[in-house]
Amino acid sequence: MTNRTAYFYDPDVGNFHYGAGHPMKPHRLSLTHSLVLHYGLYKKMMVFKPYKASQHDMCRFHSEDYIDFLQKVSPNNMQGFTKSLNTFNVGGDCPVFPGLFEFCSRYTGASLQGATQLNHKICDIAINWAGGLHHAKKFEASGFCYVNDIVISILELLKYHPRVLYIDIDIHHGDGVQEAFYLTDRVMTVSFHKYGNYFFPGTGDMYEVGAESGRYYCLNVPLRDGIDDQSYRQLFQPVIKQVVDFYQPTCIVLQCGADSLGCDRLGCFNLSIRGHGECVEFVKGFKIPLLVLGGGGYTVRNVARCWTFETSLLVEESISDELPYSEYFEYFAPDFTLHPDVSTRIENQNSRQYLEQIRQTVFENLKMLNHAPSVQIRDVPSDLLSYERPDEADPEERGSEENFSRPEAANEFYDGDHDHDKESDVEI
């Protein structure tokens, strides 16, 4: 197959609900996927229904007690887990909701399968917009995140890759990933985020640089309110180029939190969808194996626009600014475009002097790095997941005709003659 981009999507992942009034909306994943379909971008990718991560997979990073708790707790029995809820920081921002463990299993499994396919050179780019939940810690939930799919995926990548670079463009600091790899030079973490004024999670000062073997392999770029495309570009591109030149990663993981866009419900930056996408395109340009993940993003319609646009950049396909008609078309009113104006009146508090100070400090830290730390040759551990699924029929075994026929629902998406959603069927 000539196409080297793998796209992972579970049709049920958008049906989970954190609860009334909660800003995290998994439904944004359904909107994103719908646009990917209706723009025809799926034709440019290998599309996979992903593996579901097991408890064992999650315990590669998280504690067994914590994962066991996530599997057992539910809205119906949570009164019996009062002590555990406090211990594991579940409740409030990280609520117990129906299907919590199942949700974690689905988004984590997709990221893990993406890492495995990169390891086996099945693809050059793997995309999982459901992943990127970067705040989860070893022993607890944090910031709407329960299982840290990023850390688990990087651990899988490290079986084959001596050096993995992690880049985070979410408005919130990637604290869970930084903490996991703070003491090692095998993973370099680079986070661009809002810092100061008690903004969550309160970490990510530029003087947090790593420790022990990981000293100077942790890079933080703390930003102030209102940063725009031009200011962000002037920092992002030279910093990432320098990091790649110094560190020489053999694989990159890119967390594309869309809460750094202007007009985000929880954000205070002023990036446009094109400006956010420029970062993705710049990282892709290094032609290094790349795992692309979602993350934050709380104005649902703009998250879907952003990740759809970035999918188009990753597969190098130009798409129209006019959105295609889909079942979620009304979400994108009143303009129905891919690139609406998302700028706000928030003043850009990142002065030229401030940006220059950050750049100089970051480059000073980079000079302290050992170029491309090496790893001793060793046996490669077995893959964390197997591609043989016991619940799926053997494709080599011919079954009866009835196994291959099914009713075709009128509201389902089909490519070709089976598509019921003809232009004549809809009134706009």
Swiss-Prot record:
UniProt keywords, alphabetically: Biological rhythms, Chromatin regulator, Chromosome, Cytoplasm, Hydrolase, Metal-binding, Nucleus, Repressor, Transcription, Transcription regulation, Zinc
Record flagged with keyword Transit peptide: no
InterPro entries per the UniProt record, alphabetical: HDAC_PDAC, His_deacetylse, His_deacetylse_1, His_deacetylse_dom, His_deacetylse_dom_sf, Ureohydrolase_dom_sf
EC class of the enzyme, as a word: hydrolase
GO MF terms held by the record: chromatin binding; histone deacetylase activity; histone deacetylase activity, hydrolytic mechanism; histone decrotonylase activity; metal ion binding; protein de-2-hydroxyisobutyrylase activity; protein decrotonylase activity; protein lysine deacetylase activity
Binding site residues for 1D-myo-inositol 1,4,5,6-tetrakisphosphate: H17, G21, K25, R265
Listed Basic and acidic residues bias regions: 386-405, 415-428
Subcellular location field: Nucleus; Chromosome; Cytoplasm, Cytosol
Activity modulation: Inositol tetraphosphate (1D-myo-inositol 1,4,5,6-tetrakisphosphate) promotes the histone deacetylase activity by acting as an intermolecular glue between hdac3 and N-Cor repressor complex components.
Catalytic activity as recorded in UniProt: N(6)-acetyl-L-lysyl-[histone] + H2O = L-lysyl-[histone] + acetate; N(6)-acetyl-L-lysyl-[protein] + H2O = L-lysyl-[protein] + acetate; N(6)-(2E)-butenoyl-L-lysyl-[protein] + H2O = (2E)-2-butenoate + L-lysyl-[protein]; N(6)-(2-hydroxyisobutanoyl)-L-lysyl-[protein] + H2O = 2-hydroxy-2-methylpropanoate + L-lysyl-[protein]
GO terms classed as biological process: angiogenesis; circadian regulation of gene expression; dorsal/ventral pattern formation; epigenetic regulation of gene expression; liver development; negative regulation of transcription by RNA polymerase II; posterior lateral line development; regulation of circadian rhythm
Region Disordered, annotated ranges: 381-428
Task performed by this protein: Histone deacetylase that catalyzes the deacetylation of lysine residues on the N-terminal part of the core histones (H2A, H2B, H3 and H4), and some other non-histone substrates. Histone deacetylation gives a tag for epigenetic repression and plays an important role in transcriptional regulation, cell cycle progression and developmental events. Histone deacetylases act via the formation of large multiprotein complexes, such as N-Cor repressor complex, which activate the histone deacetylase activity.
Protein family per UniProt: Belongs to the histone deacetylase family. HD type 1 subfamily.
Protein name per UniProt: Histone deacetylase 3
Gene field: hdac3
